[in-house]
């Protein structure tokens, strides 16, 4: 993007140079020329009134054959070439040898040769040479005003900009990052595959494949081929099969479908689709389909709030909790041509809100597209030609700080990024593998199977998102029945950050992405109207949690008068009524529950095992119950709705003959008095 901007500015700033006659130059030659024939030929070559361009060029060529070190003749030849190249919109590299000869013979001949030589090297991405000559242009000093173009100030500004960006690019290229891409077999074939995406569980790969039109008569693509929306499965050895066309309602019309994202439970597929809706051009919007027992529901638009009725909306990527969607759009009101937008879903109504621009940390006056939000929920990858890069679209990453604010976008580095467009990048859930699709005749020359293929590589550590795994579980009642329509809230016990799990409303099964960098314990709280409070603390410190965490089972029952439940993970210091810090988060969550259900009246019951004196245990259990009552009142729960009582060892729920039974008996129980 920067090169294009500077090139355009160059065309504007160079007009005076092209219009400038050689007669305006200093009348004295830098080096005395004794050859009269060469002098005569030069005089003819600069006489634009008498001779046409072909004749002048012939005079210059003959002049330089006689006197190759004739500085002014070399400069005149360079000017003629530059004028021609400008008119033909071609690089003016052919003029560089003449400019170099001119300044080699006469360094002070004119300021502009340094500018054009530097610009040419800048355009060719020969940054060291570009910096060298552009700096000479900036430092050029002479009392003769004729040695400066009328547009010198504009050229000076452009030269300084080119120096700045050339230095930045050189610094980026010196920091070469590890990059050893290999083609993803199975998915990649001799035909084109692109717009790929691998599901968060790493088992499914969605992509678009071009196939010969032949016996097909729908979903046409250019070159007599058809675009199919495909899905491939990964086997136990980690290899994808070649894939098959997505079943109906996909691939049934001429509407192009692809560029998708899917919820972590593989149930909700969001994708872009381009279709004609009455206008002369197809409109690209974001759609959704739900999977129920391997059957996809009818396709529907994500919502009127999200899709613009006229402009392009595409390339969705979904957060791990399923409630935030990032996408690219060229709608008006942004920072540039294509911007990244964010829309959030109301957990209650399930309606997507009005999209908000992702802001200037991400979007520029250029174009930003193909966003990918990792399951860690704090690392976003996207492609941009507005942030500083190597040329075309480069891949960038940006992270959130502890306050949830975006920090600064970083170029992912060379040679992952090159002078060509680098787009469609995403990262595996475990953070270790990067994926992208690329044209084999570009930077992947010779490594592909077809033209456009999917590639993978080990992503270097500094560019990785936070390592993430998925915690799964299910909600049941005390009879083992599935609970429908419940919510599962996950709270970090240290930061208090809250996340909603993705819950299957019909089965009660849930799934949530867990950031493994934060080794803090997690509090899982189940919420459902007219049901009792239920929570469980999960430790992520165990090494086995990294791979496939054991599914969590949480029990929740109807909140009936006379029913009771245990407050799990509530601990006190030994022989004391003082709560441990780990218990605070549980009681804070319980306080929220009581405030959300202000009509419930409870009795807090303290219980102990049978070790020790009965009277002492009764007193200890009562003190603990009152400690809980005081904590809840401090958090805003009405004291009128709470009573507290200690029962000591008198109401065991397990045998006191072993430690396992005794630990169950040491508990804080909640009795629902009325609701």
Positions of the model-derived regions?
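Alpha-helical segment of the N-proximal tetratricopeptide repeat
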Residues: 34-66, 82-90
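Periplasmic OmpA-like peptidoglycan-binding domain that tethers envelope proteins to the cell wall
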Residues: 384, 388-389, 597, 605-675
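Short coil turns that delineate tetratricopeptide repeat
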Residues: 68, 107-108, 142, 598
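Short, conserved micro-motifs composed of acidic
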Residues: 30-36, 109-112, 116, 123, ...
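Periplasmic peptidoglycan-binding/tethering modules of Gram-negative envelope proteins
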Residues: 462-489, 493-601, 675
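TPR-adjacent "capping" and linker segments in tetratricopeptide-repeat scaffold/adaptor proteins
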Residues: 21-40, 106
